[in-house]
Amino acid sequence: MSVWVALALLGMCVSCTHVPPPRALIVSKEPPPALDSAPRPAIPEAVPLPSPVEEEIAGRLPPAPAAAPERVPESSQEREQKPESSKPQVVEPVSLASPVKPREAGSVPDVLPVPEVSSPHVAPPAPPAPTAPRPHRPSPPPVSPSASKPKQRAVPPSPPPASEPPREAEVQAEPEPAEDSPRAMVPEEPPEDEVPRVSRAVQLAVGQKLEVLYPGEGWVYVGEHTAQPGLRYHQRKLEESHSLFTFSAEREGDFVLAFSYFDVFRGDFVSDALAVKVVPKREGLARVVRAPEYRRTVSSPPDTVVSELSPAGTGTERRAEESGTSGSQRAAAHTGAPVRQDQTDTAVAEKAQHGTPRPDEKKDREPTVGGRDPVPSDAVAQGVSERYSPRKISPASQPSAPSAAPIEAHVPASAHKEGQEKRDHLAEARQFCAQGNARDALASLGDFFAQFPSHERMDEAWFLRGQAYEINGAQRNVRLALEAYKTILERFPHSPYWKKADERARFIKNFFIKIS
């Protein structure tokens, strides 16, 4: 390698130093000689030196095999000296169309045998190793199908079971809880299938609203017992520590409204029901009807009527003595039995002994529809089924012979008079307002408020009072008129006069800057 590098450097130096002499100083007329056309020596190309990494890799590689010597072409004499057997034989192709010629003796076969080439470097295949002969096993004898089945073992008979003692009943009756245990203190809810006890009844027409008032805040509405449409439930609200339920009549029929209340002192549920009869729609009736008031009695004698049909808005419980009849007479009235003379005399004597109640104490009167026309008690009682009766009458108090005694005989005559007085007061006040007579209108309304403080047409009375105070004259008072309209807006949200009262109240607030 170093020799080649030295030669390359020497050639480069020679080519650089071979410069012809300057000819500018030679003055000669002869043309300059031609440049030397002799070929210059070829400069060998520089071979890059291998890096140490390449040398290390080249040292690990195996040596390259030696190149095969070049074959020298044979001369014509050498070809002639070769034996004929070494010359290649040419096999003529045989066409399928031409017939096959028979072979001659001593002719060369069509297919030459391929001589076996034995290489001294290839070892002959080793013979297989001898295997040990397997021992001979005798074949098992043939098995018959009967012998293939497994033999069943003989099971000895089990001894008869010994008589076991009778076991006790798995389900035993649970012991009743003690009175002081927590389980005994938990109240049981009333069964759903139990028929509620009807304590009151009310009648209203289609389109009217029904208000049911219960004392206390724990009352809830359970549902309609007959499960028929026609009476729609609206809401429950608290009004001065009382529960007020609102319904509306949409279809005719007889309904039973069930209510429930939990008494914390007794630890039991109190159930109550209200019988409602919806009649066809009528004109000129009040929009809201108040159901009779609920009064619960702890204990009552057999001849006491727990609940009576009372007018809308003032229903009470009364005993047989208040109406001047005994329990036997009331039972006879409901069952149609005759009343003996001695029973009537006894009732009259009891009435004279206790005294006749004053008119202001008589709160029981006949049911009315919207406070307009009195409804006979037999019409209301007819709408209530016999199974909803509040109490069964003992057989001892039932006479034997039937009779037709009307129920209206036990209703005080003052009930009809009171209903007439209510209509007269409001009719007079309306007439006086139409005539512009505010003094007489306010006087009639004052008598109405004093005598009937819980009438179902109280909203109409308050509206007439506001109208009377707006009449021009000595009685004009805008502040009192505004208070009357506000009373309707706050206490009677379902009143038919609510919209008119709201309009008048807005008018007074907008057009009167200072109300004195």
Curated annotation (Swiss-Prot):
Residues 122-144 have a biased composition (Pro residues). Keywords: Signal. The keyword Mitochondrion does not apply. Residues 1-17 form the signal peptide. Residues 29-197, 296-426 are annotated as: Disordered. InterPro entries: BamD-like, TPR-like_helical_dom_sf. This is Uncharacterized protein TP_0369. It comes from Treponema pallidum (strain Nichols).
